Amino acid sequence: MSSSVTSKYVLNSFSSVPRLSYAKSIDIKDSLTDLIKIQRDSYNAFIGIDQDVDSGIKNIFQSMFPIQDLLGRAVLQFVSYSIGEPQYDEYECIKRGITYSVPIRIVLRFIVWKVQEVSFKEVKYVVDEETSEKSIKYIKEQEVSIGDLPTMTSYGTFIINGVERVIVSQMHRSPGVFFDSDKGKTYSSGKLIYLARIIPYRGSWLDFEFDIKDILYFRIDRKRKLPVSLLLRALGLSNSEILDTFYDKIRYERCENGWVVPFVVDRFRGVRLSYDLVDIDGNVLVKANTRITLRLAKKLASDGLKKYLVPFAEIQGLFIANDLVDPASNVMIMCAGESITSEHINKLKLFDINEIFILNIDFLTVGPYILNTLFLDKNISYEDALFEIYKVLRSGESPSLDTMKAFFDGLFFEKERYDLSTVGRIKLNDHLGLDISEDVTVLTKDDIIHVIKKLVLLRDGEGFVDDIDHLGNRRVRSVGEFIENQFRIGILRLERMIMDYMSSVNFDNAMPCDFVNPKVLATVLKDFFSSSQLSQFMDQTNPLSEVTHKRRLSALGPGGLTRERAGFEVRDVHPTHYGRICPIETPEGQNIGLISSLAIYARINKHGFIESPYRKVDNGVVTDKVEYLLAMQESNYYIADASATLDENNRFVDDMLYCRHDGNFVMVKREQVDYIDVSPKQIVSVAASLIPFLENNDANRALMGSNMQRQAVPLLKADAPLVGTGMESIVAAGSGTVVLAKRSGIVHRVDGLYIVIRAFDKEKNEYLGVDIYNLRKFQRSNHNTCINQKPLVKPGDYVRENDVIADGSAIDQGELALGKNVLVAFMSWQGYNFEDSIVISSEVVKKDVFTSIHIEEFECVVRDTALGPEKIMRSIPDVNEDSLSHLDDVGIVNVGAEVSAGDILVGKVTPRPPVSLPPETKLLVTIFGEKVFDCVDSSLYLPIDVEGTVVDVHVFVRRGVEENDRSLLIKQNEINGFIKERDYEIDVVSEYFYDELKRVLVNTNTEYNNQNIEDYLKSIPQKSWWDIKLSDESVLSQISDLKEKFDSMIENAHSKFDQKIDKLNYGYDLPQGVLCIVKVFVAVKHNLQPGDKMAGRHGNKGVISRIVPVEDMPYLEDGTPVDIILNSLGVPSRMNVGQILETHLGWASVNLGKKIGNILDNIDELTIAHLRNFLDQVYDGQDLKYSIRSMSDDDLLAFAERLRDGVPMAAPVFEGPKDNQISNLLKLADLDVSGQVDLYDGRIGEKFDRKVTVGYIYMLKLHHLVDDKIHARSVGPYGLVTQQPLGGKSHFGGQRFGEMECWALQAYGAAYTLQEMLTVKSDDIVGRVKIYESIIKGDSNFECGIPESFNVMVKELRSLCLDVALKQDKDFLHDRKINN
């Protein structure tokens, strides 16, 4: 494919180095700017940012109101709604542990009518004589709060009770009609049983199905099945109307020789004649027993055959189309649908019937299914049909006709109880070829009739069943839709409450606010966000895991599938997933295929269907027009692969191309191609698009690679991959972890906590204001990883909108950096890398290459107890001074303190009941004046497995309770931060406006007070510049405008400051009985150690088996020791060859960097030309090549300096470099093209026999850390029933000595050890007390008792009425004495 447009590379200090990319296709990067668009758009559509457009909230209010009381005396109307601003910002909500929400207020109008008379039957209103309308007694209008709505953060998440959560989108079957078959599995004969199902968005399901006898039935909500004729009769159709609806009629006219029938070609196709085919003139055209082909039938028609004769007897067995009555005597000859017999033929002659209509049923193309079903239900009436349906759904009641009719209408035909939704109506219209308005979201009679018709056609062999796994039949429910459904439930509850209140309230005193209880809606929303299966604790391990979680699609959850019942078909990859759902990224366990990820370019349309983008092809030429297609639309077009070769005019080079069409691959001419893929990577998800050489890996390993990248822990120093895919910067920018510039401007000030930018539009030369960015420092994520943002810009830098100005965790220069580039050798080493184990160099640990920071949160709650309040204090009973060394005077640990297991973080005492002292203690107290503590130590201690540094302390004191010194200090620090922000903003605003004022004044070139104006300005304070009065009116007007803008911005800065101070002084609302909460955050440093899990990006995972001294590690010829040794046997069987290609490309990248570094170390004018030429060779065929040629020498040197550690490369998915391209890079770096080198044994210094594959791989440290898993116990808790130690680290349990371990001891004959394991070390209560006493006494003897598990077994046997008792055998004891 042709390369993209050349763009000059602009070097700046804060952007990443552009990658040497092997992409051949033109990327539509606009589609990748917002990776969490799926969440944001859905939520915005619900809340209706633009109130002119119908939104979810607006529609709900309009459907609920107006509400009138039961007698119609008053009405409550909806006028408008408004959404307020959040009380606290996102960070403050996390800190306070509250929900990030906005208040919703609605304006209600309460109208009370004037009435003359009120009775139970009717109300007589007073009518206005002028307008002839009901006369109004009074109107009251009021704005009412209906509760708070959790609102979405700028990152697409929700903060519920201080915790970030994500609402996962759900894949479910689209509303509409579906036709299917049982695939011959129901009956042993293998006969296909066809069925249809109408699924609404809300309401009862309606199923139609055939049985083995081809009788058609229907079910409502999967209840007992009934003949479909009952439903048709309940819809008001008679027998003849039903037959007219489902069958064509054939007119038979009687003549003396038989019946004259119109000749229709289709009726004779493939028919063997049972009689001679004779025209009306008596000519025999075709003899009996002749099979008529389509060709012969068409010839007869073309020869002029319009009508033919049927002998009288041949109508026997046909079905009459309508009731046949003798007009003279009014005698019923035949009923509609009845089969004609010889008796009926005689009656036709007797009553001289000259014309009859026959149902077109030939048993080949048209079957008698509806007719047979009609005869099954014994000709029941409309009322009986309604009763039969009512009886199945509401058994045990005897209803009236009106009740049954209202019930039946409510099932499918009333909006309140049944809703197909717009999507369902579109699908029904599309499926059945109807043209019913999209606003009609209930079923119609036509819908039901057309569904039955199509099902009958399927049984007759016409058409195909639906593929329920086709993405045209599955849609996505996103966050906005979920909240809308919950909102609707809350509003319906509120409506019922309003109706109840209206029936009992005095209207004269009532106001709109009296009718609304805001807690109703809040309760429903809280339940959904807190406990729904699709409202999930956000995976915040690293930026990629955040993005992936927000783009996840789940088939589970309410209204979805269950993992136990989901079959293989629904989990499998479907052809329509191409470009919509990633075929790679899915969990490995029982949820495989049920949880998936949105493809990288896919988007979800307003109806919830997934669209994929394609570039339009016009007569073999690829245009730049991008169109999004649905899965249903895509099957109609021929779509070429993105890797198709184009010439310089964007025309296909090949005459014939492989294309996708209707789920198959076909070869077509280039002129027939309709579309082409926008990119080869459009098939995969965000995580899979980050794996270089994905196409060289087995799919199972690619799946593991995608999933393990989400488990990578952010490291102490982030390092972007040398071999990437080009997606790293896009994922970083879309993750919300980095700080993006809101507006273009010039960086004014930067420190560790703030970036201050003077927003400025260069093109318009317009000042826009001040943007202050607060950086997040050492904050705890949901998964205890560290969130820490570092500024990239420096004062004076010009930044554009959406530039990355600060890195977050696992981000390096605006690129995703989940791991580290390390030197890897593929070889065996002393068996320590057996079974995927990893051998690592001590140098890696020493340099903190894979060290990560984790932040643990510990909470201490101070309560008001029945005996008095608990207190935070430094003087704690029975605790020595050394243990209090980390605490301040208040009793709270100092920030920066190094704490280890058992240290006190918060000193706290709890009152205890007074105890009566013995006389001797009272005497000592009296003599020595010793203080007797009436409280106990309840301090917050650091758990045993934690050691680290205190990085932050939060103190929340209940509003109205006196604050301690520490909380006052923390508050003062926050106020100082607000002051700093305000002063920064005022400084920037003042600097700009005074510069502008000076420019305006100086440009006048006048004198003021007998001085040059510029000199005069220097001599007076800046504030006095505004007071200068000039004679020029235009200059005064300019100064006035500047002053007005300046004052407005300064006032705005002070206003924001005052609001922040007010919120801070407001205090904290804590739970009942809680006086104070102290949260201590401890940063724990995790070094790499044996037992930690590591992985590459290709599914190559392993556990560290040994950390080898650096001097013992194999080393290169130049003495460089390798960092990691991997087992080469881990590659062939796993078929993830991508890791080897990455090794070679990484090896070339680093050595090219070394070569550039060597040139830079000896730089002069000649070598600059050599450097430019060398970079020209490295970036050959790249757009960047032209930028390098035109760079100044200084820019070139700065650019080359950033390539010292390696030349960053991009191997996009399905567009990675070929073998020859990697070989060329290795040659350019003066390396062996095999990618292998001689290695030397670090222990003995000898060269290994064979060359070894060595290179640089991007390795990740996963969050399965040995520190979190390793566990030991000596004394601990026991189970209540079994009296055995509990299991698991969380319960501080023991190690289970299981069945197989017992076998091992039995095999060795270690009887006493076995006895010890099964008794005193397990559940022998008496024995363990005795052994404890023996240990204290220093005695080595112990005695075993009866294990508690034996007693449990005995009791279980007794519960089965089996009395088991232990008896001592006297003879056995006697024999034992004699033997002794």
From Swiss-Prot:
Q: Using the record, list the residue span of the signal peptide; answer none if the entry has no such feature.
A: none
What domain of life?
Answer: Bacteria
Keywords annotated in UniProt:
DNA-directed RNA polymerase, Nucleotidyltransferase, Transcription, Transferase
Any one Gene Ontology molecular-function term assigned to this protein's record: DNA binding
Listed PANTHER family: DNA-DIRECTED RNA POLYMERASE I SUBUNIT 2
Similarity comment: family membership: Belongs to the RNA polymerase beta chain family.
| This protein's name | DNA-directed RNA polymerase subunit beta
Could you tell me which species this protein originates from?
Answer: Ehrlichia ruminantium (strain Welgevonden)
